[in-house]
Amino acid sequence: VGLIGALAAQAHEPITTKLTWTQEISRIVYQRCASCHHEGGAAFSLTTYDEARPWAKAIREEVLERRMPPWGAVEGIRAYRDDPSLTALEVEMLVGWVEGGAPEGDAVYLPRVPEFSAAAPVSMSAAGGITLPVTLQKAVTAAAVTPRDLPDGASMEVTAVEPDGSIEHLVWLRNYRQAWARTYWFRDPLVLPAGTRIEVNAPAPASAVLSVARPGNER
């Protein structure tokens, strides 16, 4: 009865937006969400309008709270590769679509649903890992940070303090979920001089590993 009532309410919601699933919203979902939200994926499918429409209000809440797509890293600390985070414009469009009645639009504009397969993880070039915290004995090119044993709901800050006192924020994870476990590869690897102290601010027993780029593969 609840689902029938919800669907009936949706059917009577006024349409007050020109944003549609077939033109704008499906493209955002396919690019940012569907890698998990597809048939057989890690979460319920959102690849069709009929699948996404009942979740419209939940989608609005999740994107406004920046809980979806799951990423973990606080925005603005550092640029990372493969960051699925929504842009401000994408958030605005998703919210506007939901608040405007979540219309479907003309099927002629609908893009092809992407295909997904269980691909092997992409391996970035790295010479090895350094367990943190640590004081560097020689200069290194930092390529990535991987959190270890960070509990659900906890936060972690990894910061490099260089010998001259300058500070580089490597990653800040907030309200972490172990299901999000990943390596945060820097878009631009960072040269850290000898004597740099890399600190980890996180609850025990959490730690982190710094991946170091191989010479000649800094980018």
Task: Label each residue range with its predicted role.
Residues 122-192, 199-219:
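His-enriched metal-coordination microenvironments in redox/metal-binding proteins
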Residues 9-133, 200-218:
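Aromatic- and Gly/Pro-enriched helix-to-coil junctions and flexible linker segments
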Residues 32, 194-195:
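Conserved SET/PR-domain catalytic core that frames the SAM/AdoMet-binding pocket
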Residues 1-6:
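Bacterial N-terminal signal peptides
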